[in-house]
Amino acid sequence: MTSQHGPRLAGPNRPAQEGTSMAMRALSAPADVLAQPILLPYPSELPDGLPARPRVLQLTDADAVSRGLADGTPRDRASNREVRACLELVQATTRTIDPRARIICAASSATATRHLDVMTASGGNTWLVRRGLDGADRALLEELDHLTDIHRMLHQPGRRRPAGPAELVILVAQDHIFARSIRRLRLLGVPTWLLVPGRSVARELFTAACAVTFIGPRPQPR
């Protein structure tokens, strides 16, 4: 499966990929998980060396949520209710791991306009709105690259050590554009737990993440 964002894998029941280790197999949330007040299970695929309560940076591509949760339906966008349920699920799961986690949602101006009610009612999140089709991607890449720079400093002798950088990234996305950044963070000892909003994910992004969970979309009534 291909798109403007590169080759994509359908999930969660896709064939095994050559070169993909068991540590990268996809976890699958129940199909109706967005309707349930439960948290996503903490994936065993994350490294054993993580602290029991790692500091978390949680990033959400709201464009991917808006379009991904509409996969398999005649709609091009998810409803406000579906988007809100997804964001609440991710936020609740993140806060369970790190109550002080930094949570950032990025959206293009078109997505922000479509889901303005969700944005204005969303508490505890920082919203970044950018123009253009890849505006949300660029905003999140800046956050990932900033975290990379901080961890590079930690590996340089004689440099002042920054206080409390994130030790785990929870990323809600589908596009391959994030693969390089999370691969670099992984080499610096910062794993990424990828949450996929929908049925497909770019192959490069899937293989770069340490753990993958598919969220929805919810089954449609017949």
Kindly give the residue locations of the regions a language model identified.
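Domain-level signal for Mg2+-assisted phosphodiester chemistry and nucleotide/NA-binding surfaces
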Residues: T2-R14, E18-A136, D145, P191
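Nuclease catalytic cores that cleave nucleic-acid phosphodiester bonds
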Residues: A110-R222
